[in-house]
Amino acid sequence: GSTANDGSGFKNAELKPTEIALLENIKQVQHQQNLPQSSELVKTKVSKVNLDIEMETGTGKTYCYIKTIFELNRQYGWSKFIIVVPSIAIREGVAKSLEITAEHFLETYHKKARFFIYNSKQLHHLESFSSDAGVNVMVINVQAFNATGKDNRRIYEELDDFQSRKPIDVIAANRPILILDEPQKMEGGKTLDSLVNFKPLMVLRYSATHKTTHNKIHRLDALDAYNQKLVKKLSLIHISEPTRPY
């Protein structure tokens, strides 16, 4: 892991394990989670590492992937993350979650994530995303790189107001870890294929229903979530009960 500084900024360091070792690690996690074992790394046009996390709606998916960002940073030093969402409404919701959980994660990880919503007219944020050594999170909706409007095409164009660089090249130079929120809502045609331009180190897919399955490493359905909440509640009740003499 770790973050490499190549002069232009701090990018995610490459994955060190071989594909065989990676698959073994995935199988270990699957075994712990009582999930079917993968026979191979499921590769896509976009990345050679594609992990599926299956979580029902309402089970804290956004919280889970924000925590994953901090854990990956703590354990492997990776610091460049892009959360890809299917709509502007979800994009705003994710940004809000990053904002309201900041203090909570600061207590555990002693750092804050610098996050921003990608906007082709405000590329100074992207500049900071590359040059900053801390945890950096970009939130982008698929329309921003997949629609045909003038503003949406800017991501692929050499821009005078961006030192004659293409935003997509600056993004790709970071070798970001991609987090796809509800990928099944973005799997129309070439949408996800165009993520190859981001040159991701790996792709993590968080969804209740995966149309296409890759290497599944976690599954939490509504019943599991309910039971876990119940267990939490019961243990809290147990702790808070005053001890009575017999």
Show the residue positions of the predicted features.
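Conserved RecA-like ASCE ATPase "motif II neighborhood" in helicase/translocase motors
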Residues: 123-128, 137-175, 186-193
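Conserved Walker A/P-loop ATP-binding site and its immediately adjacent core
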Residues: 79-102
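Walker A/P-loop
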Residues: 47-67
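Walker B catalytic acidic pair
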Residues: 181-182
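Conserved nucleic-acid-binding Ia/Ib motif block in the N-terminal RecA-like helicase ATPase lobe
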Residues: 95-136
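Post-DEXD/H (motif II) to motif III coupling segment of the RecA-like Helicase ATP-binding lobe
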Residues: 188-234
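Walker A/P-loop NTP-binding motif
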Residues: 63-77
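Single conserved hydrophobic/aromatic residue that forms the stacking wall/gate
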Residues: 238-246
